[in-house]
Amino acid sequence: MNIVCDKVLLSAAIDGVSKAVTMRSAIPVLEGILLKAEGFQLNLTGYDLEMGIVTTIEANVKEAGEVVLNAKLLSSMISRMPAGQVSILSAENGKTTIQSGVVQFEIQSMPANDFPELPNTGAEETLTIKTGVLKDMIDRTLYAVSQDEKKPAHTGELFEILPDKLTVVALDGYRLAIVERPVTAVKDIRIIVPSKTMTEVAHLLPNDDEEPVHISANRRYVVFMAGGYTIMSRLIEGEFLNYRNVIPADSRTRVTIDTKDFISTIERASLIITERLKNPLRISFTEGRVVVRCQTNLGRVVDEFNADCEGDEVEIGFNNRYLLDALRNARTEKVRMEISGPLSPVKVLPAEGNDFLYLVLPVRFKND
């Protein structure tokens, strides 16, 4: 293989596909990127046997061919090359020469035949959605994905696709995040996408919010195509919780709150909460105000701010981090909290509209 290409394009492509590369593996080829030159382009592939990322850049292909190079080493070298054109020459003796200007590296390559072939997913296009919409849905829900490997179905995000609606759901047993958006889909399907895949999809989506993202899916695989990248991933098997059954049907207390005021108050109260001292926040919702209290061995705090409260007065215990996560991901000037009782899941919604629905599970006080 013998090619010449632009350093900036090559560096960006390497960084993109490296998200699917295993950094430490007993199989060295899985730590590499497959480079394949043909026609007028260079194809780059990273694949960790669960997720594969492929992209293409323009190149002056003097000799077609393919080779596997260590991803970490290749990324470090290219990023430190001078600006301009980079040449890559792979010889039959297993050595690859990479040169830009007066800088020249010679590194050991790996045979392309050893690189695992990406599966033929057989996934058919299911829906097309704007980049900005999909990124917003991912960003608003990913925080609630479970880290508990004992419940693998909840370590991913549920994609519930209907002909006219896409619902993305994440939960971890303590909180729930739901975002729905109107779409036009070809078929109904319910899949669980690994959180790692969703993280990398969000990172690789183009900056143009209007650019389309093509999503193809079946029962085993999902494929995202956008911004010159194709991201293929295996799906998580298992049953996702019937999340609709845990959403309270009614509420006895409704509170409309300035989001920034609430975040600032919780952040101040959190100063006396540590990993070792995890006492819950004690939050009272009364007519016209919200009072936040907390006491640990470091000290105690009382803070309050004005709010529009309707219905029964109530005092609830919250994990400070879980409540902060919901408020920070709301991204609205005001939120509405709907409360059924001191031990029932609390709804967090936008003050107007239905952009999202978050649930936060209260914490029982020790003296209850």
Model-found features: residue ranges?
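Structural preference for solvent-exposed beta-strand-turn elements
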Residues: M1-D368
